[in-house]
Amino acid sequence: MANYTAADVKRLRELTGSGMMACKNALAEAEGDFDKAVEQLRIKGAKDVGKRAERTTAEGLVVSKDGVLLELDCETDFVAKNEDFLKLAESIVTVAAAAKPADVDALKALELDGKTVDTVIQEQSAKIGEKLVLSKIASFDGPVAVYLHKRSADLPPAVGVLVEYTGEGDAAAEAARGAAMQVAALKAKYVTRDEVPEDIVANERHIAEETARAEGKPEQALPKIIEGRVNGYFKDVVLTEQSSVQDSKKSVKAILDEAGVTIKRFVRFEVGASS
């Protein structure tokens, strides 16, 4: 006969965040001694940290606050919508918004509830039972627009874009948010074509030329064909040269110009993406 009650199991789960069977086993091994059961689960959690470190984190969320965008990753979508995980992300982004750290390492070193952010993450990892990774952070100073996209209604945002812009008024803010939505959808990498590195442009020209020659295009037509294909590349990766997802008859640049907006920079985070 078990020397613990269902109430003990419930209390232990609430205190440690461990699964039902883990709590039952801990209470059984501790012969009903609640404090010993807590200690055993804490020790097991510490031992599991090394194992968790080797696992991949392909789920998670992107969250934003006051000019900060950050990504917190986990292993499963079940944890991605876990209340403790959501609260952890909100706590971290609140700290980040106040301090505006330069990078992930700087954010991990900041204080949260009397501990470092990194320590809090590791403690939550042990409690939840999954590897948790604070993978990305960006912080902008000027007026910003944010767009967060959910892949599924029951999950938190998995794609986030933070745009810094110049412009005034509601129309400018709306246009900037439209630009953020554009980046989320079409994955632009640059604001203008001037930002595209010369070596990348040169490589695109080389590919366009070699492809055209392989297709047997006439020599005299090559310059125009190459230019057209390079311009096509710019439309793929340059925000201001794309057709707007909100109004396909206009370019993003035209919409921004109408609202008096200049995009200074942007970042796009996507859970599960390598960069």
Swiss-Prot record:
One annotated Gene Ontology cellular component of this protein: cytoplasm
Key words, A-Z: Cytoplasm, Elongation factor, Protein biosynthesis
Pfam families (UniProt xref): EF_TS (PF00889)
Region feature Involved in Mg(2+) ion dislocation from EF-Tu, mapped onto this chain: 76-79
Family annotation (InterPro entries): EF-Ts_dimer_sf (IPR036402), Transl_elong_EFTs/EF1B (IPR001816), Transl_elong_EFTs/EF1B_dimer (IPR014039), Transl_elong_Ts_CS (IPR018101), UBA-like_sf (IPR009060)
Location of the protein in the cell: Cytoplasm
GO molecular function, one term: translation elongation factor activity
Family, similarity comment: Belongs to the EF-Ts family.
Function according to Swiss-Prot or TrEMBL: Associates with the EF-Tu.GDP complex and induces the exchange of GDP to GTP. It remains bound to the aminoacyl-tRNA.EF-Tu.GTP complex up to the GTP hydrolysis stage on the ribosome.
Protein name from the UniProt record: Elongation factor Ts
Taxonomic source organism: Rhodococcus opacus (strain B4)
